Amino acid sequence: MANYFNTLNLRQQLAQLGKCRFMGRDEFADGASYLQGKKVVIVGCGAQGLNQGLNMRDSGLDISYALRKEAITEKRASWRKATENGFKVGTYEELIPQADLVVNLTPDKQHSDVVRSVQPLMKDGAALGYSHGFNIVEVGEQIRKDITVVMVAPKCPGTEVREEYKRGFGVPTLIAVHPENDPKGEGMAIAKAWVAATGGHRAGVLESSFVAEVKSDLMGEQTILCGMLQAGSLLCFDKLVAEGTDPAYAEKLIQFGWETITEALKQGGITLMMDRLSNPAKLRAYALSEQLKEIMAPLFQKHMDDIISGEFSSGMMADWANDDKKLLTWREETGKTAFETAPQFEGKIGEQEYFDKGVLMIAMVKAGVELAFETMVDSGIIEESAYYESLHELPLIANTIARKRLYEMNVVISDTAEYGNYLFSYACVPLLKPFMAELQPGDLGSAIPEGAVDNAQLRDVNDAIRSHAIEQVGKKLRGYMTDMKRIAVAG
């Protein structure tokens, strides 16, 4: 099979990369009605599989789970989760032939085997759903022409999808119809009903394409979302300890620092995150972030180039075929790093202390978010998509590090994200070591003293922060989510 994106001509590639439309609330007036009375069969019962299924059932849809025969007979975790939540469970052969919509929510690595198993069992005119388009775009999976292929991609982990639904809200979501598989022209109606059933329509929906979702998703997770957090954690910890900081304190400052810093990012973007600093610290964080952007820009561009060309995917799929040798080696090496094995700090670190003593970490977040966004937009991805795949998801990933350090992050994210994370961090750590050697007192681990600042310089820095394109689009999208949340709570 050929990489689907590489079979398109340049005009088609640009059109699909640039497909992004923020959908109005009135477009979801019918809710999930298009799928009511139809049979929806979910394949896979992991975090997305279970939590999307719970939401869809609560929205009035007929949901069941198709699992491999051995998963049922051996009562594996997927079988236990589905049955404990009261769902009907059966084998592929028992459930797929009656399904109107088959939703494939297994890991990327399993998609080809799953799709090749279920396709022959699907009835004529049925629909196949994904929450990530890797199998279609990068693997180039060929789907029967009578089958409609759609995507609903929540921009949050599965647990968050469920929690927001229970609060009467939802999570921002991308939806798409594969242009090669929409024989009856009903793909968008199916996708809209599916996303409404998950609650995503209450938080904002982007009509996108399989191509735009995959290329932007890969770029975000490899660079700012996972790779930058891993590289930053290792670099900052080693720097602190080398300068005499207690390893336990250094570990806590970093482990919980990312979450604290990005909580401000979630509420008010880069502007609010930078506003948490004193004026001298803000000026220093800005200067550091500009240096970091200059150093890292070629690395971010290389990752985007390799994602667009398919070089990244072909390399990762070769590792799949080699029993994940590279992935497992990198995972083991990460687990042995000084940061991962450092003792826990029993004392308390106040919220503001994370900002005051983490100026470099704030600079890394700012540089990484802006670079990921800029690199995606320069490659033809629309700003709204680039925002969701950079700034929006960062607090969610930072939260996983706060739970169990890098181990937890790499367990929670997909194998695809983990592989890309290692590629980036293994290149980024040596790249930034000369920069780390030139840091000044107050950049990390101690606060920058209060002092006089140049008013004109502070004005210009504030203007530069606020006028960046990601701040403009972010303010619009966060405002929409806030407005929608008020409506959901009120109604």
UniProtKB/Swiss-Prot annotation:
Q: Where on this chain does NADP(+) bind?
A: 45-48, 68, 76, 78, 108-110, 158
- Catalytic reactions of this protein: (2R)-2,3-dihydroxy-3-methylbutanoate + NADP(+) = (2S)-2-acetolactate + NADPH + H(+); (2R,3R)-2,3-dihydroxy-3-methylpentanoate + NADP(+) = (S)-2-ethyl-2-hydroxy-3-oxobutanoate + NADPH + H(+)
The protein's GO terms of the molecular function aspect are: ketol-acid reductoisomerase activity; magnesium ion binding
Involved pathway(s): Amino-acid biosynthesis; L-isoleucine biosynthesis; L-isoleucine from 2-oxobutanoate: step 2/4; Amino-acid biosynthesis; L-valine biosynthesis; L-valine from pyruvate: step 2/4
* Binding-site residues for Mg(2+) 1, renumbered to this chain: 217, 221
Cofactors demanded by this protein: Mg(2+)
Q: Where is the active site?
A: 132
- Family listed: Belongs to the ketol-acid reductoisomerase family.
Stated name of the protein? Ketol-acid reductoisomerase (NADP(+))
Q: What is the lineage of its organism?
A: Bacteria, Pseudomonadati, Pseudomonadota, Gammaproteobacteria, Enterobacterales
